[in-house]
Regions:
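Nucleic-acid substrate recognition interfaces
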Residues: 1-311
């Protein structure tokens, strides 16, 4: 137990040093305990055996919807974290298992995925089918969260600060659930050995900070990275792969004739009209089509600049 405490404190200091511009003294307000599998905790006879200062205790548990992960022949338990939340104890257990890696030669389907705000994702696949997940309801709900947050910030009371924190956590959980649903649908609606092609949005925060102030909250805080990470690990589970490519000109290039021009895209009405061949379509769909084309080029060993294979 002493070793677990030491490692937790060191990890918190490292996080502060890596993420903060100035030094902030770490605080530990919520009780937590990191447990190493087979040393600090184990699972026997449908009970968890947990090491404490007063010896090992056996505890019954509830695992609704998670029972499949308790098959030791498939899943391997990692270092768990015991936390107390609203008077109840939760054991967060990371599990790992081996999956077959997907080889490029096995790829049978390519899906270009354009991420955005009006549409969470727009897709285009090898069957030349397009798909859209609307972001309208998400934008509306996040706007309501933002309005409520501003009202609470003006009160400057202990209760308003507590509620602010709770609202932030609730919004984060809700957005993570949305990303889980979207990434799960993308993987399940496509066969094994699919290549998903995303834009490399590493610099998205710097770009979105140049938008109008009234739109900045939505643009900067949109969880593109979280969706990306969830898609990567779900794709691996389905023997599929994810690559990230240079996003330049994906919304300005005509997928039919290859003509690139900034005025091809009308952002206000979300319409792409090629000035050369006249091809018209939704601008997000155009982005997905161009990402699909870059995926095909990648498989054909053609030069696709700045391609990153997601790990």
């Amino acid at each position: 137990m002493a070793q677990s405490v030491l490692k937790t404190v060191i990890a918190r200091y490292k996080t502060i040093l890596e993420n903060q511009n100035e030094w902030i003294k770490p605080s530990f307000k919520k009780p937590q305990y990191d447990l190493v599998w087979n040393r600090d905790y184990s699972l026997t006879q449908n009970c968890f055996s947990i090491n404490t200062l007063n010896g090992r205790v056996k505890l019954s548990y509830f695992s609704d919807g998670m029972s499949k992960y308790f098959d030791y022949t498939i899943y391997k338990f990692g270092t768990a974290r015991l936390v107390n939340k609203h008077g109840k104890y939760y054991l967060h257990i990371p599990v790992t298992y081996e999956v077959e890696e997907s080889n490029i030669s096995d790829i049978c389907n390519v899906v270009g995925i354009d991420r955005g705000i009006n549409f969470v994702v727009a897709t285009y696949d090898s069957k030349h089918k397009s798909g859209f997940v609307s972001g309208k309801a998400i934008k509306l709900k996040r706007a309501n969260y933002s309005k409520l947050r501003k009202e609470l910030q003006m009160r400057h009371t202990p209760s308003s600060r507590r509620r602010l924190k709770a609202i932030g956590q609730r919004e984060n959980r809700w957005m993570q659930d949305i990303n889980h649903q979207v990434s799960k649908a993308l993987v399940e609606n496509n066969p094994k050995h699919t290549l998903f092609v995303l834009e490399d949005l590493s610099g998205i925060r710097n770009a979105t900070e140049r938008v109008k102030t009234k739109d900045r909250y939505v643009s900067v805080s949109w969880s593109f990275y979280d969706l990306e990470q969830k898609l990567i690990y779900k794709a691996k589970q389905n023997q599929s792969s994810v690559i990230k490519v240079d996003p330049r000109y994906t919304s300005q290039c005509c997928p039919c004739c290859g003509h690139i021009e900034k005025s091809n895209r009308n952002k206000k009405i979300h319409l792409f009209t090629c000035k050369k061949c006249g091809y018209k379509s939704n601008d997000d769909r155009i982005g997905a089509m161009n990402l699909y084309r870059m995926g095909i080029n990648y498989l054909a060993n053609s030069q696709v600049p700045n391609t990153v294979v997601a790990e």
